[in-house]
């Protein structure tokens, strides 16, 4: 019991108990603005006809917000006013201020709660002295790891991490790390009133989706911390899985201790459940070869063990979310596939293991014999179907992949239209540079290239053929990256691998820290 208690407390010792007073500091909201938390239309610089003030008056609005936070029933009154204004249609300015204040509070709160975790990250990097830390942040850094490790693995689990169904779950997780009780009460009250405000207009199961759309940074922080807590518990279970005793299969099916419901606080509840779970008679497998990778809400769990072991971890995840986070998770959201027969979609790539058979004739003195060899290669391909679906959602083509024009961009200049289409192509080429086959990427480029031509032809009220003849090859040059032109002079166009045909060289860049927006659409 003391060992488990120490494990959960050793990383939670650096708690910051005095964060609530920062809500009343003007520089917090100025910092939120300076860091560009609202790049898609900042709430600090709204149009004059909506705001009634110029952009220099945002500081006065921040001061007014701080004064209203001191008031006892500000949130309740603002919610009632906003609901009345929504239905009646009067006092539009007051309703806008209530919505404006809620967004400002969410952004300021996101800045405050990020402070202790940022300090902890900086101190951790100084202690560990990790070289080239920025390279490890790259999304592409995970694929060389896959190339080395997944070649010898048997199964992979495709996991979709669920969203909590209630905001209180996020607050309870956060209170394990932050001891500032007034700040947690303020967050709980803000989330409660915010969801009640939107419950008049949306259903209950969409309240979190509405909250995530309007307060992106705060929800992103809460969700990322929730995922971190999931992984924190997963690492604990993984480290202690080898301590389980080997017994008969019948006791494995019972699992009576794990299903016992415990009424305790968040951390104590998990420790007690884990104690009963690990001290009970449970048949388990020791698998030292297990690897885990995650990006956003999707995770990959690969193992060298058997299918039964993967099912064990599958139900461990289900029970974890059910008894620790107190919400139901459907087991069908975790897919277990055999790596030799299935591919998995992760980080915008379709990854799989390719087996290549070859026969080598060996001659020794007067005897000759044939040797059959098998080589396995980690292959990454461009998910053409997913990208075409993303392009159709963005209105660049139809569902079947037929290019169409982009009417909303016809008001731009010709150079602006070409620059936008070219930037999309360059980003896709840069991100999918690790694909072993480029045919799918060429198809996506062709769709964007023809969509650009159709958009320009629509702007000038001409046909695509006439416009391309007048433009010449200048349009095509905009869709090549500078790196592709440089690499074509350095690397050969085709590289022959052993026991394979001619394939393109895969290149992984260590400066990509986010997924392309088109991949998120898919």
UniProtKB/Swiss-Prot annotation:
Q: Where is the signal peptide?
A: none
Q: Which family does it belong to?
A: Belongs to the intron maturase 2 family. MatK subfamily.
> Which molecular function term from Gene Ontology is one that the record holds?
RNA binding
In its keyword annotation, does this UniProt entry include S-adenosyl-L-methionine?
A: no
This protein is called: Maturase K
Q: Which organism is it from?
A: Gladiolus papilio (Goldblotch gladiolus)
Q: Which GO terms describe its cellular component?
A: chloroplast
Biological role: Usually encoded in the trnK tRNA gene intron. Probably assists in splicing its own and other chloroplast group II introns.
Phylogenetic lineage: Eukaryota, Viridiplantae, Streptophyta, Embryophyta, Tracheophyta
Recorded superkingdom: Eukaryota
**HAMAP family in the record:** MatK (MF_01390)
Biological process annotations from GO: mRNA processing; RNA splicing; tRNA processing
Q: Where in the cell is it found?
A: Plastid, Chloroplast
Cite the entry's keywords alphabetically.
Answer: Chloroplast, mRNA processing, Plastid, RNA-binding, tRNA processing
Record InterPro entries:
Domain_X (IPR024937), Maturase_MatK (IPR002866), Maturase_MatK_N (IPR024942)
Q: What Pfam families does the record tag this protein with? A: Intron_maturas2 (PF01348), MatK_N (PF01824)
Keyword tRNA processing belongs to the record: yes
């Amino acid at each position: 019991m003391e060992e488990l208690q120490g494990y959960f407390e050793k990383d939670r010792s650096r708690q910051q108990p005095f964060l609530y007073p920062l809500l009343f500091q003007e520089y917090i909201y100025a910092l939120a603005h300076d860091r560009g938390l609202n790049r898609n239309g900042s709430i600090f610089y709204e149009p004059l006809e909506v705001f009634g003030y110029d952009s220099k008056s945002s500081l006065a609005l921040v001061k007014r917000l701080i004064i209203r936070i001191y008031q006892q029933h500000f949130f309740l009154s603002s919610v009632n006013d906003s609901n009345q204004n929504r239905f009646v249609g009067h006092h539009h300015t007051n309703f806008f201020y209530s919505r404006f204040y809620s967004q400002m509070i969410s952004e300021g709160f996101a800045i405050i709660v990020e402070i202790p975790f940022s300090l902890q990250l900086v101190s951790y990097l100084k202690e560990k002295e990790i070289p080239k830390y920025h390279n490890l942040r790259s999304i592409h850094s995970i694929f060389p790891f896959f190339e080395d490790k997944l070649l010898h693995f048997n199964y992979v689990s495709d996991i979709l991490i669920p969203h909590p169904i209630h905001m209180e779950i996020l607050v309870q997780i956060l209170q394990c790390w932050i001891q500032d009780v007034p700040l947690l009460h303020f967050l709980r009250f803000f989330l409660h009133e915010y969801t009640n405000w939107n419950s008049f207009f949306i259903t209950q199961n969409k309240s979190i989706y509405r909250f995530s759309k309007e307060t992106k940074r705060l929800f992103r922080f809460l969700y990322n911390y929730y995922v971190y807590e999931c992984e924190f518990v997963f690492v604990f279970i993984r480290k202690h899985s080898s301590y389980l005793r080997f017994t008969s299969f019948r006791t494995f099916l019972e699992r009576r201790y794990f299903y016992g419901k415990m009424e305790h606080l968040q951390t104590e509840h998990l420790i007690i459940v884990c104690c009963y779970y690990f001290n009970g008679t449970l048949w388990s497998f020791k698998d030292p070869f297990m690897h885990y990778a995650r990006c956003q809400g999707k995770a990959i769990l690969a193992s060298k063990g058997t299918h039964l072991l993967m099912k064990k971890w599958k139900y461990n995840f289900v029970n974890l979310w059910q008894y620790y986070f107190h919400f139901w998770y459907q087991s069908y959201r975790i897919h277990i596939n055999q790596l030799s027969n299935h591919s998995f979609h992760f980080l915008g790539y379709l990854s799989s293991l390719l087996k290549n058979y070859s026969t080598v004739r060996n001659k020794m003195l007067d005897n000759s014999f044939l040797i059959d060899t098998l080589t396995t290669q980690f292959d990454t391909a461009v998910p053409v179907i997913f990208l075409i679906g993303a392009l159709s959602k963005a209105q660049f083509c139809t569902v079947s992949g037929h290019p169409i024009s982009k009417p909303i961009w016809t008001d731009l200049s010709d150079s602006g239209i070409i620059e936008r289409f070219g930037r999309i192509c360059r980003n896709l080429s840069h991100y999918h540079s690790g694909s072993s086959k480029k045919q799918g990427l060429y198809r996506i480029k062709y769709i964007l290239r023809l969509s650009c031509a159709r958009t320009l032809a629509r702007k000038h009220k001409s046909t695509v053929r006439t416009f391309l003849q007048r433009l010449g090859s200048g349009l095509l040059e905009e869709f090549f990256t500078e790196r592709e032109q440089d690499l074509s002079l350095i690397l050969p166009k085709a590289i022959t691998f052993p026991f394979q045909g001619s394939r393109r060289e895969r290149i992984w860049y260590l400066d990509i820290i986010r997924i392309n927006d088109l991949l998120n659409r898919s």
